[in-house]
Amino acid sequence: DEPLDSKHNEWLMKNVLSDGGQFTGVSDLVTKYGLVPSTVQPETYNSNNTRKIDELIILKLKEYALELRAMNADKKAKKDKLEARKVEMLSQVYRMLVLAYGEPVQEFTYTLRDVNGKEISTETYTPKSFYEKYVGKDLKNSYVMLMNDPSREFFKIYEIENDRHVMDGANWKYINLPIEDIKKIAIESIKDSTMMYFSCDVGKFLYS
């Protein structure tokens, strides 16, 4: 019901989706849907060159947002009609994604081999059962995100609104620490063979 030119809606229309993300989003996705080996669902041209499909999805979502706003502005519009139309819209977006990336795998057979290529076992999995067997950890509750943001006070937890990969997932939440502390934690994680996910803001260097 907010005006289209409100600060909130203006931000949403400028940030429809982003091609990337962070650990919270990944943990939400794999916990909900699972994982498959790349041999089961290989990369496509579009998964290696995502800009064009991103642009098409963004345009389609903006179009749908304006249509839903117009329907909602009609006093006679019923909620069930709005919901039904939204489902139709999401079905079209899903179709676009499937055409670009392929239909999500529901079940597959996977052969585990040793370093010499000798077969160890062959089993049938769903993406969820594969994730549970070969990852197993509770990614959503076993890890925390650390960040070095000098523009904000250190030793506090921050949450980024509307930064999530799934609607029922969690926003990007992190503990803000001095870079010296993060370096020490990174060194300790290497020493005890615990993998540490790492990313950095390099956008300003891409075209320098």
Language-model segments: residues:
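Structured alpha-helical subdomains that flank or immediately precede key functional sites
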Residues: 1-208
